[in-house]
């Protein structure tokens, strides 16, 4: 059993650090904050889709974070979304200490027309190609 724990702990830790090594794609800039998403994390199951997004804040937030990664789930038929997990970091691009750790799904909410969430939903639900905003 001791031999198994030597490789099991590093394996588990590497699974949880995967989001930090994501291939982020630029989506746009909103009020000084940069929004990115990771195409490689897109998973579609029936009419639901999940994907990771990352926000790099232009200034430190009230929670003392400079970046926040969110795992989104979309109900493509009902035009709703929720966060499956939210993590906040003291540095941009998920660097530094993780100050926010919330692996609990939120309640479903409506996707607002013209929002960043809607842009990601359009890609995740294959409604049309995702175009970066200028």
Named regions from a protein language model:
Residues 9-16:
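Bacterial N-terminal signal peptides
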Residues 19-134:
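N-terminal secretory-pathway/extracellular module detecting exported/lumenal segments
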Residues 1-8:
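Bacterial N-terminal signal peptides that target proteins for export
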């Amino acid at each position: 059993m001791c031999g198994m724990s030597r490789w099991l702990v590093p394996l588990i830790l590497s699974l949880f650090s995967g989001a930090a090594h994501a291939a982020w794609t630029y989506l746009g800039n909103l009020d000084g904050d940069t929004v990115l998403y990771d195409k490689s994390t897109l998973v579609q199951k029936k009419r639901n889709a999940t994907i990771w997004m990352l926000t790099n804040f232009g200034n430190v937030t009230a929670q003392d974070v400079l970046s926040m990664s969110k795992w989104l789930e979309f109900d493509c038929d009902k035009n709703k979304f929720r966060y499956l997990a939210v993590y906040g970091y003291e540095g941009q691009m998920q660097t530094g200490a993780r100050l926010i750790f919330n692996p609990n799904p939120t309640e479903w909410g409506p996707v607002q027309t013209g929002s960043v969430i809607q842009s990601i939903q359009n890609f995740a639900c294959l409604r049309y190609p995702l175009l970066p905003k200028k």
